[in-house]
Structure formats: C-alpha cells, structure tokens
UniProtKB/Swiss-Prot annotation:
The keyword Cytoplasm applies. It comes from the Bacteria. HAMAP family: RMF (MF_00919). Transmembrane segments: none annotated. Keywords: Cytoplasm, Translation regulation. Belongs to the ribosome modulation factor family. During stationary phase, converts 70S ribosomes to an inactive dimeric form (100S ribosomes). The keyword Cytoplasm applies. GO terms for cellular component: cytoplasm. One of its GO terms (biological process) is regulation of translation. This is Ribosome modulation factor. Pfam families: RMF.
Length: 69
C-alpha cells in the first residue's frame, strides 16, 4: 500500500484505466493537478481502447496494467 502512495502518477494512470474500461466519461477525472490529470487521461484512453476491443472482465486480465506486471 505504501508503494502506491509513493508513485501518484502511476496510481492516477491505473485509476483512469479502470474508469476507461468500465465505460465512464473522461469528464469525471478527479485530478486537479495538470500532470496527474494527464496521466489519468492517458490511462482512460488506454482503458477505452481495451473496452472497445473487447478486453473487459476476465478476457482483459492480461491487459490490465495493475495485475499483469
């Protein structure tokens, strides 16, 4: 858990990825810091691409950046 707190940009990317895969709008980005917002949007874009390609649920485990390292 402490490792997640150290790298806030990676955490923002992962949260954006999860939002994109689940189909949420990018307007829901919670980040106020411009750099963190950019990382969240990058994750959201990758998540949306995976969502459109059908990598959701169990079929997307190998694509999830938080699980498959």
């Amino acid at each position: 858990m402490r490792r997640q707190k150290r790298d806030m940009f990676e955490r923002a990317y992962l949260k954006g990825y999860r939002a994109g895969v689940s189909g949420r709008s990018k307007d829901l980005c919670p980040a106020a810091n411009p750099q963190m917002r950019q990382e969240w949007i990058n994750g959201w874009r990758d998540g949306r691409a995976d969502h459109w390609d059908g990598y959701t649920g169990v079929s997307g485990i190998h694509r999830s950046p938080g699980i498959a390292s």
